[in-house]
Amino acid sequence: KGVMEFLLANHPLDCPVCDQGGECDLQDQSMFYGIDKSRFKENKRAVPDKNMGPLIKTQMTRCIHCTRCVRFATEVAGVPELGAIGRGEDMQITTYLEQSIKSELSGNVIDLCPVGALTSKPYVFEARPWELKKTETVDVMDAVGSNIRVDTYDWEVKRILPIINEDINEEWISDKTRYSCDGLLKQRLDVPYIKKDNKLQKSSWDEAISLLVNKIKSINSNEIGGHIGDMVNLENALSFKKFFKVLNCNNLEFRERKFYINSSEKSNYIFNTSIKGIEESDLILLIGTNPRHEATMVNARIRKAFAQKKIPIFSIGNPGNLTYDYTILGNNSEDIKKILNKEVEFYKKLLSAKKPIIIIGESALGLKSGKYIFEEIKNFLKKNNFITKDWNALNFLPQNASTVGLIDLKILSEENEKNYSFFEKLNNNEFKLLYLLGSDNLNLKKTNEFIIYQGSHGDRGAEIADIILPSPAYTEQNGIFINLEGRPQECVAGSYPTGEAKEDWLIFNLIHQKLKNKKLFSNFKSLRENSLAEIKNFNGMNNLPKKEKGKKMSFKNEFQKEKIEIREIDYYFSNAISRASKTMSDCRSIQKNKLLEGTNY
């Protein structure tokens, strides 16, 4: 009671207007242990609010100086931008030079704050916790598959919070996961559209599907191409694949640009060490990847391993400003060749490590010698017993939530994998009809082809489409996503589709019915069973895949000297949902120094 009295001495009694109300630690403790009258007769301390950017709203008079936020920023996020100034009654928590926190994890301080001093700026006065429907699901903003809770009020997603999962995201989530949810309310496709007289006009489902079917019938199957986007679940991708099989067409792709994938065994295209396994490692080598932007929660684990054990971290290619110290070993493919040929000092460090980790990014595999880089590193690790039953040092870091699942579904044919036939046909304008399933990041310029776009947002794909078929976003339909470790997790619908939008697999059913007078799948249950049967080394939901015996394969690996440039990701604008989000737009403007900071914000 005494401690509570001290804590509440300077605390304003503004619970009714505080966003933390109903889920506040201080409120709960006061309820159990507090007294109903204050003996504090002096003037209460008042502190001016600080600017912490577009994500965190401050009311520093409520602050009880627990310094959780300071410790989080320094120790977990690795961006020491919060601190305390003054002493005694004049102590204040603030950012240096009053500017927004430049971290991809900054929103987690809101969950850590035990009072209402730090709250979510986009969520201010939106709802009370008991009014919201809460759904436990997974995130699809990157390939990590962070466990999240989606809070909805009727159709609207009001906020997204983390769920503790020690194997994946611990208790943190990235700012993009947490704050891009306002993009789910904007730029939505709610009715089918058909392009008439060079203008998109609303139409009925029947009219749109009749036009689509007639178009498909009039075109040779070799001249039809399909591209699957970055947030498509396993079931919808499988129904798309089956639909293309009915059309007798093999031109399917999911990569947004060329990069090498060896899909012969599962360990070639997943993060074998596992996210939790990063903490056990004693040396990390990054090749052509910037984990801070490509997989924020993987970067947080690397930061944790570095902070706890000071493990040495090396990089080939310059990833820019990471949240830990690292050494650049070089920036071209020849530097990898030198390591493998024992020509550099680093070779000894790698061999003396007991549990090294090598993380290969899409930027390295996108080179002409991407195949050489991957296969030779794999051979090297096998030869030196770094790929065993207990430890696999080889890790591929995909950037999209759907990547691993789509490789499992064999969307890549062997032929396509070797020579990127989809991209070649696309560049040579060989497609007369292009079907985009939630695909907004493909570098595509409309020429003469007929484009069908099926997705949730009026983004880059819908912009150039001749027919638009509206489908739900990830929060509005059930589906399985396989994360970068190869762990299948269910994404559960927390809301419902907007307007006349239909689930993707039901749309393919409608088209197939018009084409062949029968459904592709009779119900979602049979589609789910078919999808689970396709998963390689399936070991049950939420579990890592079964270990497999590696096949001996000989490859002709052509080496070319090339510079390894890590492709810069527009982090806050990486997909259709985040591009529709005003909050993400504000974050991006600050990142690019377009917004005034500090008191002028």
Placement of each model-derived feature along the sequence:
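N-terminal export/assembly segments and adjacent metallocofactor-ligating motifs
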Residues: 1-345, 352, 362-364, 566-601
